[in-house]
């Protein structure tokens, strides 16, 4: 298969004509519990779709929130009185047959670019141990990694976007 296939990344909202196709792919890749969890509706949510030849072949969902209180039971992290924010990737996947073509990397890069525009301090993602392709992708992109445990063993990935000295 030609690895130079063309694809595009776009943000979707529930009123987008391709929303049903997006939801179907999220469900097919078993990410609906993260992508559509009502808890995350209280935050700014972003749904990204990778399209190739008019079809959705990959997705990424992230929220923007304060670092600390929402999933770590920790007070917000502040520097010089300013609360640091992060883009937290909650759901991500690429259809079988479209992997290893740069689609996942492009989705991650788009999320990182948006996080920078939103003034986020970092991008963070947690992934269960059963997703080695995601782990390799994140490590290849330069994310730091740390083992952690929740209901299952998992890995936390963090990509710093700016130092605390940057305003």
Regions found by a protein language model. Name each.
Residues 1-35:
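Short amphipathic alpha-helix that is part of the acyltransferase structural core
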Residues 3-7, 140-167:
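C-terminal "cap" of GNAT-fold acetyltransferases
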Residues 90-99, 127-128:
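A short, internal acetyl-CoA/4′-phosphopantetheine-binding micro-motif in the GNAT/acyltransferase core
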